[in-house]
A protein has these predicted regions:
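Cofactor-binding beta-sheet edge motifs in enzyme active sites
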Residues: 1-266
């Protein structure tokens, strides 16, 4: 609660490449940690000067700089004030101010993993599908904000259900896109998406100090094959072995008809 984050102001921060590809915390967070380490290192030197102690004896914990083995301490806010109102300040060895920048270019990628399980009901007479239950367990490394991670999974699964069952770019014989607006492009609604059970395991990423992995795409990657596999499994005894996305009622009905015709011919 003592930190205010300035969003999207290029007058305040350096230009960045963006947070695409689930990079927000795995890349931006690491740059933030590097900058914070620079800040605390400099603040520790200022605290050592103010507390008349050696830099090696300064400890930082819970927003307080303290001298090891003593009751002498100084709050971070007081150190920051001293940095910008530098009375009795060692100007010859330390610049006033408490502002740092950091750049982080990851040497490797992060690899989240998980398991998604979907339960569906399929009406073989009409080809309609109802998604009844969905369970998603993912490993995104250390979870910094559980609410954000769960929200990413919920949103991703909803998108994945749409991709698996409803969404597609359709062109007519003249090449005209016929699904170019929300009037024609089918997307999942609340009644198409079930309540979800979301969980996580934690395997720390070895490529960054936070141990985090990207979570922005785990829902959209795991859910489409889970939905399609559930549909195919439900129709396995009818001879259906594969259905291309989106698995619309028409495609499912046709797949059942083709499979039954093949079985009858055998």
């Amino acid at each position: 609660e003592s930190v205010d984050i300035v969003h999207g102001d290029t007058n305040k921060v350096q230009f960045g490449m963006g947070t695409y590809g689930s990079r927000s915390l795995a890349v931006g967070g690491e740059a933030l940690m590097k900058a914070l380490n620079k800040i605390t290192d400099k603040a520790g030197k200022i605290a050592a000067h103010c507390l008349e102690a050696s830099e090696a004896d300064i400890e930082f914990k819970d927003g307080q700089f303290s001298v090891a083995g003593t009751d002498k301490s100084m709050a971070f806010g007081d150190v920051a004030l001293t940095a910008y109102v530098p009375h009795n300040f060692p100007h010859e060895t330390l610049e006033p101010g408490l502002e740092e920048n950091a750049f982080y270019d990851p040497a490797n990628f992060t690899f989240p993993g998980g398991c998604h399980i979907c339960e569906v009901e399929v009406d073989p007479d009409t080809g309609t599908v109802s998604v009844e239950n969905f369970i998603a367990v993912d490993d995104v490394g250390r979870v910094i904000n559980p609410m954000i991670v769960e929200g990413q999974v919920h949103g991703g699964v909803a998108q994945g259900i749409g991709q698996a069952l409803l969404e597609g770019c359709v062109y007519d014989d003249s090449g005209q896109l016929t699904t170019g607006s929300f009037m024609d492009y089918t997307m999942p609604r609340a009644d198409n998406v079930p309540d979800m059970d979301v969980g996580n395991t934690v395997t720390l990423c070895a490529h960054n100090s936070l141990g985090v992995k990207g979570c922005g795409e785990v829902g959209t990657i795991g859910s489409p094959p889970a939905v399609i596999n559930a549909i195919v499994d439900s129709l396995w005894d009818l001879g259906v072995r594969d259905i291309a996305m989106p698995a619309t009622p028409q495609k499912i009905w046709q797949a059942i008809a083709v499979a039954q015709t093949s079985q009858a011919a055998e």
